[in-house]
Amino acid sequence: SNIPDGEAHVMPDGKVYIYGSLDTKEDSWCSNQYKVISSADLEHWVESEISFSIKDVPWADEIQEPTYLEGVKSYNELPEAILTFLPEETREMPIDQFLPLLRNILIEQQKNKSLFAPDCIYKDGKYYLYFCLSDDTEGVAVSDSPTGPFKNAVKLPVKGIDPAVFVDDDGQAYYY
């Protein structure tokens, strides 16, 4: 498997575990599931079964209205992420005609959400997998094992991609 965007952690059993996106197709990145790879010696690696799936995300079927399009009066006001992928010839269409088309595309894309790069920590006897979806929602799921399965996903009150977490020497956990 191809697991890009990896976050490596030494867990209490002394093994290194890598958590990352899971590319399952050659023509696209990310997918709707995660696997974990681990090693006791950094030479021999073991790939887990599916550790987490988008099917375990209660809000995965929700459609987020692209509210950031409200009030846009010109192409220059669109988010940079959209402008990057927007063909130059598209800008010839009047913005008031283009925005409804863009909204429909953005809504349609949400029907095929992906899981982006996760991270995982061990704290108080449990493993916490912090994950994000392609719609910028984020969550956390828990397991008794560093390779999952991670369950009981809870939505976090933040938006973004590729969360990172760590536990400091004093036991305080940080999420960023």
Which residue ranges define each predicted feature?
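Carbohydrate-active catalytic/glycan-binding domains of CAZyme proteins
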Residues: 1-176
